[in-house]
């Protein structure tokens, strides 16, 4: 429960900040051009019975704007006079146009009002990333310093990769570290350079691998190589009863050779698949009975040991942490140096996110969509300011990009119509705008339902 509350608090804080500043971008340009803003709210305020839905509100003297906080913490809004938006205030639109309304302003001014929120979110993301660079710098393990190399699945090996290859880069430049961006770059690469046996080898690819498939397949396309060497043993487990010690190396499981901890976990995964089909307790015990070949570090002797794995198929040891032994790169930045570094980092995040959107239109892409639960789970389970701000910056980029998509009801939908008006002189009617917003809003609701339904299905283990 504590973890849930910590993540929920971080999620609400981040979304509140992003929405407040996003709507503040619209508000700033509206005020700049003399457009009246009727309401500026953090959170939504749908009325309940006779209650107006506001936890707090005030209207300064000589101001036409009511400021407030609603009770539904899912965003916020800025209600601009004379604008057809999701509030669908048709009564206001029936009145004669006024000089202080959105609809009477030149198209270029209306365009700035509409892109104001997106502009603020992009600038905010780049600013946060810059301040992260200034406060914490960058810490990572370069792929070229991962001296054990990588472990590849059969698909990767068919393309020319080999276990223990050290990833260097593509035709676009060097890899930085092992992360989602590395998968994206490999999927788009025509050439991947690796260090194999001390020599540089180039592997030719088609530049169109399915990144989502590379990540989701079991075992994955590529992962850091982890030797099957014992680092520590949990007391009371099968491993402790076998007297396994630090430095012991596992060579085989149930007659199948394993040259890495990666292959060991893959073999356990196959047992789990068989356990699903086990119908009796005898079947379960038979599958849990494991024959393990071990070389003991202390004596150099190799033994074949038999044990019964735990009901959840645990042997009970932690492998040697190769990542802890690798050289870590730590880059630090001065205040002014942090801005170009933060902008570069933010741009890489944005380009990676945009490049991954093509997978939304695939079956696996739809299944990978996540709603509020998935987003909330991305925050750390304990309070960590570094991760909080990094996640907030990432969400700011997502909010900005999703809002600029040319979908009616989003900022990008208005921008599309405004650009058409500026180029052709044609201004869509209010009736057309209302219908377009209905369609766009329906699409957004459908997307939210699918994303949050996926969260529910994952929670019950269906997906």
Tell what function each PLM region has.
Residues 22-25, 69, 156, 164-167, ...:
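Terminal peptide-recognition signature
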Residues 2, 96-105, 217-252, 257, ...:
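Functional transmembrane alpha-helices
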Residues 10, 14, 76, 80-87, ...:
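Internal alpha-helical transmembrane segments
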Residues 3-93, 402-424:
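Small-residue-rich helix-interface/hinge motifs
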Residues 28-29, 33, 37, 41, ...:
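Membrane-interfacial segments
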């Amino acid at each position: 429960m504590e973890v849930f509350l910590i993540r929920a608090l971080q999620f609400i804080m981040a979304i509140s900040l992003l929405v407040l500043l996003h709507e503040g971008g619209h508000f700033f340009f509206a005020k700049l051009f003399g457009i009246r803003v009727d309401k500026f709210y953090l959170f939504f305020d749908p009325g309940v019975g006779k209650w107006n839905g506001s936890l707090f509100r005030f209207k300064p003297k000589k101001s036409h704007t009511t400021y407030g906080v609603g009770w539904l913490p899912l965003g916020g809004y800025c209600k601009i006079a004379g604008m057809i938006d999701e509030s669908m205030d048709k009564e206001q639109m029936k009145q004669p146009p006024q000089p202080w309304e959105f609809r009477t302003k030149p198209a270029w001014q209306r365009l700035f009002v509409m892109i104001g929120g997106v502009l603020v979110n992009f600038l905010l993301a780049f600013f946060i990333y810059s301040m992260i660079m200034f406060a914490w710098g960058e810490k990572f393990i370069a792929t070229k310093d991962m001296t054990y190399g990588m472990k590849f699945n059969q698909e990767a090996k068919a393309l020319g990769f080999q276990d223990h290859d050290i990833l260097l880069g593509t035709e676009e430049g060097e890899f930085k570290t092992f992360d989602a961006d590395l998968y994206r770059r490999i999927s788009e690469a025509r050439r991947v350079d690796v260090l194999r046996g001390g020599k540089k080898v180039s592997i030719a690819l088609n530049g169109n691998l399915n990144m989502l498939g590379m990540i989701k397949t079991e075992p994955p396309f590529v992962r850091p190589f982890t030797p099957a060497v014992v680092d520590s043993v949990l007391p009371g487990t099968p491993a402790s009863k076998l007297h396994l010690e630090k430095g012991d190396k596992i060579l085989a499981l149930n007659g199948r050779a394993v040259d890495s901890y990666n292959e060991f976990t893959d073999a356990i995964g196959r047992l789990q698949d068989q356990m699903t089909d086990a119908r009796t307790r005898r079947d379960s015990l038979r599958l849990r009975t494991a024959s393990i070949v071990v070389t003991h570090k202390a004596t150099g002797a190799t033994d074949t040991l038999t044990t019964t794995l735990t009901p959840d198929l645990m042997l009970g040891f932690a492998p040697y942490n190769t990542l802890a032994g690798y050289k870590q790169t730590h880059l630090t930045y001065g205040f002014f140096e942090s801005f170009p570094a933060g902008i570069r980092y933010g741009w890489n995040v944005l380009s990676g996110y945009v490049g991954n959107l093509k997978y939304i239109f695939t079956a696996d892409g739809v299944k990978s969509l996540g709603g509020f639960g998935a987003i909330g789970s991305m925050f750390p389970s304990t309070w960590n300011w570094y991760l909080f701000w990094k996640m907030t910056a990432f969400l700011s980029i997502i909010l900005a990009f999703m809002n600029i998509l040319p979908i009616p009801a989003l900022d990008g939908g208005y921008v599309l119509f405004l650009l058409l008006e500026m180029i052709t002189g044609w201004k869509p009617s209010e009736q057309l705008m209302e219908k377009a917003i209905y369609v766009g809003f329906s699409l957004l609701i459908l997307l939210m339902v699918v994303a949050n339904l996926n969260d529910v299905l994952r929670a019950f283990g269906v997906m």
